[in-house]
Amino acid sequence: MPAGVCGCCGPLRPRYKRLVDNIFPEDPKDGLSKSDMEKLTFYAVSAPEKLDRIGSYLAERLSRDVVRHRYGYVVIAMEALDQLLMACHSQSIKPFVESFLQMVAKLLESREPDLQVLGTNSFVKFANIEEDTPSYHRRYDFFVSQFSAMCHSMHDDPETRTRIRVAGIKGLQGVVRKTVNDELQAIIWEPQHMDKLIPSMLFNMQDSDDLDRAGHPGTPSGAGQDGEENPASLAESCFRELLGRAAYGNMNNAVRPVLVHLDNHHLWDPNEFAVSCFRIIMYSIQAQHSHHVIQQVLNHLDTHKKTAPRVRAGIVQVLLETVAIAAKGSVGPTVLEVFNTLLKHLRMSVDFEMGDSSRRSSCVSVSSGRGKESEERIVQNAIIQTIGFFGGNLPDYQRAEVMMFIMGKVPVYGTPCHTMDTSKIG
């Protein structure tokens, strides 16, 4: 009698649950049942209104398997979800996507690296799917935070650490691809997200062994010489892609975190990494946005007007690189303002040098005074060289105006009327 009761109750279960249960073998090592998966896919395509229930039931099973550490069944559930996502593109896919993202989040929250990588791979597949209609309410805040945390993994095992970081970078790249072209997801460009995205990429790019290579366009990225994925190269590729998609209104939020990261990690002296970053920026953005980057570096220089000479020199040298790469005429509409900023810092540097020189005998030793003076000379030479590159990027009709502007702005110390020798500028 009990057996008869069980036989009667079995068919009472909803068909979608029976179809879902059938894809899970008794032994998870046998993997996903392909024939039963085909039946489930056909059912989902034929009855798309059932997709949300299928997703909810799969999510329920996956959560239970994660808690019980039955990771073989977790892998099967995610494989089934991936196939359903690829096969179904109707309006009813949206509730299913919500269940899918909840399951991905469940895996990312796990402390198991294998589950984190599994969840990331599924998210990347989802990110490459073009949905028929945009989502008005979907948010990716959690994924930005979680993938960014994975990018900073400090796992004890180097190989596992690399796997987690690579997965985090791929996840961020998936978020970027899913959101940057969607006007409804413009929130991704807001500071709270860029302040996580950009530093995560730069943190991994700092491990690159070839900074000079990193700055040039068309650099092959993603895999090391042994065929394994390299976090530094992958982060650079993602960084380039993000910058290439940035509109003019988003440039400030994209570049500011770079400047802050360089400040926080003291990367202006020496400035090889800073130069590499801005080469990548200038080669990746649209040419008409170049002057916006130049202006941001100038503004950042203003905030460091009282810092150590070598830090200021490092910023000026980065500015020089951006100007050298910028297209002709891309300095922007406020040309004289740009030159005025540079000349202001040149004058301040000279003032610092003269002040130190006058106090040298009473406050510091001769050797340290000369060292301070030589450091200020480094700043001055960098500024003068940058002014020259700016002049080289100007149209011919503006150069005479700029030369007159410079001559009127920079007097030579010790003479009442003479002006700076401008033969080396422009």
Regions inferred by a protein language model and the residue ranges of each:
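N-terminal alpha-helical scaffolding segments that mark the starts
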Residues: M1-G55
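HEAT/armadillo-like alpha-solenoid scaffolds in large eukaryotic assembly and transport factors
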Residues: P2-C9, L40-L51, V66-R70, C88-V97, ...
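Charge-rich, solvent-exposed alpha-helical interaction surfaces
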Residues: R15, L19, Y57, Q146, ...
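HEAT-repeat alpha-solenoid elements in large eukaryotic scaffold proteins
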Residues: P25-T41, I54-R61, R70-L85, D114-I129, ...
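Phosphoinositide-driven peripheral membrane association surfaces
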Residues: A59, Q102-R111, Q116, D302, ...
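Long, well-ordered core segments of solenoidal/helical folds
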Residues: V104, S200-D209, L342-V350, K409-P411
